């Protein structure tokens, strides 16, 4: 275990798909991290490697090289059983909540399954289910309903509740507002900020929307074609971007300068 200023960090992380001549490197030596209680925004265009970092952290993708550190402990060297125990400390909420919810399970069963994977007993965990539904501003009666009975914004809240039910230390939100309309998007963003403060969560927020990332993040890391090109406090990166790619991204947001003038 090594000392680190970060709660969660990746060091020289490389991820590649395939082998030999057909291998395709999607992350090249990326180093970034998030401090305890803060939110790191990961931005970049489609294919930049944002989601790959998240999936490598939770073990969906395997690191070809580099380290993934949680409280200074390298997760890449852990065995399956050890990693499973650590995995509950870091939860990922993805863009499509419907895909992450079993359509044959009630919401109560889905949350109970997160708490106890061997027995998804909604009655046994009724208090826990009601607590976390309430935390994301949903009524306890939602526990008896099925995923298709909810709107996209409500399903995203349910996915967040399910992730929080195991009481993680780090929450990774991967494009969770991209499919929502503006008003619902604002509700979810405000909810995340409230949860971060009330639960002392550390967060990684992934999005291609620079305005959204600016709203929720303390620091921002900019990715381009699998490489980290810039990182720093949100205000520094947005007001004085150093890398040409970052400047191009900011220039592509039509309302960015207008919002700055109105502020």
Where are these regions (language model features)?
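Conserved ABC transporter NBD signature motif
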Residues: 66-74
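Helix-to-loop junction immediately C-terminal to a conserved catalytic motif
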Residues: 58
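A short, proline-enriched helix->beta-strand linker immediately N-terminal to the Walker B motif
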Residues: 165-169
